[in-house]
């Protein structure tokens, strides 16, 4: 493997911590020698992933109407059918416009904490700062009322926003210290055909932004893709038949990003399919060159024995890969965050030893 990402582990994004400082300190202590980049844990409002975009980006836009609110008694959606529904305001004379992306403000602020901890020696020198950014279909998942009419307009506005905000992100974080991960869950489910509110064109909703957005990121920045089936409210939102869809998406992303793709992360199966050769067999069709592949086969329920089973099955079809959780693991109810992270690190390190 001659690419820039060669580490054993990828932290997908969210961590079970209460603050950025706590996440960065724990991440550095427990995983520092296993990683090429460290995320800020996506704590606070960002723990809801694209719920953050629904509430902080889309809802405040004066040209967006709220068609319906969540029916959840707590006011917090419990699943995808309980999220607020949005529609572009009728009679909008011009294109939709988003002024700024609050997630970029958070990333720049978190980098300040990252840099301070690195200067103190808490974070190992050489680790990049990892920023996860949702792809358009995921960020704009609330436009359900008239998806066919509204989504293309919202997508253009969002892509314009991303182009402007990537410039601002790079003004705040040195390119050589940055790793950007495009996060996709709704895109994957859209291609699988399980989102009832979407329309024709699922593949293009993934492929178009790959070719339009990723080339805007300078080569000095490391870039990866996280391909996932979602954890809202539980893993997985939809159980895939096999790795075929994610392999096709990974191949396309690497071939059409207009620049180096340093890594791809592909979520794995449930534990009962740890030795299901049919699930893993499409890995033989991966054509990603030096791009580092991380398989999301670390599960919190069956420890090193389960990871070894899945690793052995995957190794029948793929020679060299790193591992990760199937998604971020900042939203595991009832689990002690520090212990969850400690167990995660122990399981991955145990993979170094012979079975």
Outline where the language-model segments fall.
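N-terminal basic, low-complexity leaders that serve as flexible interaction/assembly modules and, when applicable
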Residues: 1-77, 350
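Active-site-proximal, glycine-rich beta->alpha crossover segments in alpha/beta enzymes
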Residues: 76-174, 179-205
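Acidic (Asp/Glu)-rich catalytic clusters
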Residues: 27-29, 113-128, 170-177, 211-220, ...
């Amino acid at each position: 493997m001659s690419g820039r990402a060669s580490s054993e582990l990828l932290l997908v994004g969210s961590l079970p911590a209460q603050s950025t400082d706590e996440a960065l300190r724990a991440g550095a202590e427990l995983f520092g020698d296993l990683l090429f980049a460290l995320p800020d844990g996506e704590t606070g409002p960002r723990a809801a992933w694209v719920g953050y975009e629904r509430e902080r980006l889309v809802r405040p836009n004066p040209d967006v109407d709220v068609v319906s609110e969540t029916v959840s008694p707590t006011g917090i959606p419990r699943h995808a059918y309980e999220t607020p529904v949005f529609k572009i305001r009728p009679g909008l004379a011009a294109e939709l416009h988003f002024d700024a992306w609050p997630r970029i403000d958070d990333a720049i602020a978190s980098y300040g904490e990252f840099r301070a901890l690195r200067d103190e020696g808490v974070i190992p020198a050489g680790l990049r700062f990892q920023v996860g950014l949702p792809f358009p279909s995921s960020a704009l998942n609330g436009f359900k009322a008239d998806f066919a009419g509204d989504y293309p307009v919202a997508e253009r506005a969002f892509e314009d926003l991303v182009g402007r905000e990537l410039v601002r992100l790079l003004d705040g974080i040195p390119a050589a210290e940055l790793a950007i991960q495009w996060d996709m869950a709704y895109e994957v489910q859209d291609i699988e055909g399980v989102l009832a509110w979407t329309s024709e064109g699922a593949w293009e909703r993934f492929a178009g932004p790959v070719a339009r957005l990723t080339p805007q990121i300078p080569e000095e920045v490391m870039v990866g893709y996280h391909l996932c089936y979602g954890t809202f409210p539980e893993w997985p939102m939809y159980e895939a038949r096999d790795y075929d869809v994610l392999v096709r998406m990974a191949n396309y992303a690497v071939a059409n990003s207009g620049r180096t793709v340093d890594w791809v992360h592909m979520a794995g199966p449930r534990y009962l399919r740890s030795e299901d050769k049919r699930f893993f067999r499409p890995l033989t069709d991966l054509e990603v060159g030096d791009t580092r592949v991380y398989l999301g086969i670390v599960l919190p329920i069956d420890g090193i024995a389960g990871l070894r089973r899945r690793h052995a099955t995957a190794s029948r079809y793929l020679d060299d890969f790193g591992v990760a959780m199937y998604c971020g693991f900042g939203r595991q109810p009832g689990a002690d965050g520090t212990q969850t992270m400690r167990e995660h690190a122990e399981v991955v390190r145990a993979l170094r030893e012979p079975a």
